[in-house]
Amino acid sequence: MITSRQNAMLKLVRKLAERRWRDKLGLFAVEGEDLVEAARAAAIEPVELLVAGENVEPALLAEVSSAAHPPRVIGVFRRADLLVGPTQDTGLALWRVGDPGNVGALLRAADALGPAFVALSEGCADPTGPKALRASAGAIYRVPTCAFEESPRPWVALVPRGGAPLAELGPDGRATFVLGAEREGLPGEVLAECDERATIPLSPTAESLNVAMAGTIALYEASRRS
């Protein structure tokens, strides 16, 4: 039973709250029984497992948790055990999407409407960070990820206006949908690399869609044609 704040495993979990340590160690911490069980269902086992009341004092586990309501279980996993891709012809390529909630939600959409991959550029939120993990609802274990530039062609830029209607996609819907951060959008150099531009028609009173909603709609449209 862990009874000291100075325990090495508790120190590790604290470190893994920071991206620099996740990058350096190749590990990430997962909070909550549902997310840990989702990993096991995908045949991914934790390298360490802390269970309140079994091998660690509950108050100490609560101290290292990042959740509003501390979990009963925290598992430490290897990034190397996650799926890498792309292993499909359809997916999302995210350009500097820095909000971890959006990154997690897009992973969840790729899981629900796939099979699909998610590619991430530099500057994107870490999909193995606490907020992204919670938003992905376990999809991180089932959706392959890759670097932005590894996304297969064709690239279809989702733009707020001026693109072809999304419903006019090719007959099989296979594409990499390229999305930018909500405020900045896609820079000119990325748009120049894209093969097509598509726009989701909105009502006249709506300004734009959240990036997670736009990506979800694009994957749904692609799934209807696959």
Regions of interest found by a model, annotated:
Residues I74-V76, L92-A93, A119, A157, ...:
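Conserved beta-strand segments that form the floor/walls of ligand-binding pockets within enzyme
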Residues M1-V103, E122-G123, E149:
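Arg/Lys-rich RNA-binding interfaces used to dock onto structured RNA substrates
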Residues A80-A164:
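RNA substrate-binding interface of SAM-dependent RNA methyltransferases
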Residues A38-A39, E63, N102, T128, ...:
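Phosphate- and divalent-cation-binding pockets in alpha/beta enzyme and binding domains
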Residues G75, A109-L113, C124-Y141, G188-S226:
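Structured adenosyl-cofactor binding patch, chiefly the S-adenosyl-L-methionine
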Residues A157-A206, N210:
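Active-site/ligand-binding-proximal alpha/beta "capping" segment
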Residues V30, P100-G104, T205-M213:
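Short, conserved micro-motifs enriched in small and acidic residues
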